[in-house]
């Protein structure tokens, strides 16, 4: 059973920020199925944005990226690879928040950092809606993810309105789709896809501060 109805789909093109293949698998499958049911080509209607500079080393980053690239190919969906810059992430997100707990202020700013990059890309490339697989993980605060996504899209809207006024046009705005991607049977389907695809399933979120047993964070 699909966890998404065709009428729930956004009208314009959708950009899905992917944090990893395990969290994205059921979302991509549900979106692709809903688009097909609506008579729309998922390869034309959506793309995946890979922006995860929180990951603490390049080898880990590339390993996770390879999995989402492999999976997206099955659906004919493009993956946009954002620049990897962990040093910038450390400076902008982690500095002064190194000792913050998981689900604390560092996590909120991490989501904001990554989703701001996704929102800017969406605005610049004609995507009208942004969502993220971060909202599928039970280890993440849905409230933080939603706040970061709304902030990112509101900031892009303010920038494009200002630029549009200067240029005499309205500019491109991006809507935030703050869906709970755990519902509609997607959580158990997520776990099934991990096994079916034999995904590399990491044991920590990505940054050096998130390493260690989750129960200790």
Task: Please report, for each region that a protein language model flagged, where it lies by residue.
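Nucleotide-activated chemistry modules centered on ATP-dependent adenylation/adenylyltransferase
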Residues: 1-217
């Amino acid at each position: 059973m699909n966890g998404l109805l065709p009428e729930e789909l956004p009208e314009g093109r959708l950009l899905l920020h992917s944090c990893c293949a395990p969290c994205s698998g059921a979302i991509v499958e549900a979106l692709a199925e809903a688009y097909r049911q609506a008579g729309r080509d998922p390869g034309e209607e959506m793309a995946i944005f890979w922006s995860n500079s929180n990951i603490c080393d390049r080898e880990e980053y590339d390993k996770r990226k390879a999995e989402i690239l492999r999976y997206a190919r099955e659906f004919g969906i493009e993956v946009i690879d954002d620049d990897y810059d962990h040093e910038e992430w450390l400076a902008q997100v982690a500095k002064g928040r190194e000792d913050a707990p998981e689900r604390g202020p560092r996590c909120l700013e991490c989501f904001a950092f990554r989703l701001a990059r996704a929102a800017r890309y969406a605005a610049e490339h004609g995507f009208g809606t942004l969502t993220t697989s971060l909202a599928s993980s039970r280890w993440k605060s849905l409230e933080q993810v939603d706040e970061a996504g709304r902030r990112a899209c509101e900031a892009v809207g303010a920038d494009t309105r200002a630029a549009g006024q200067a240029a005499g046009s309205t500019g491109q705005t991006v809507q935030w789709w703050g869906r709970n991607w755990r519902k509609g049977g997607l959580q158990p389907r997520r776990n099934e896809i991990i096994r079916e695809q034999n995904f590399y399933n990491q044991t920590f979120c990505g940054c050096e501060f998130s390493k260690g047993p989750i129960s200790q964070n």
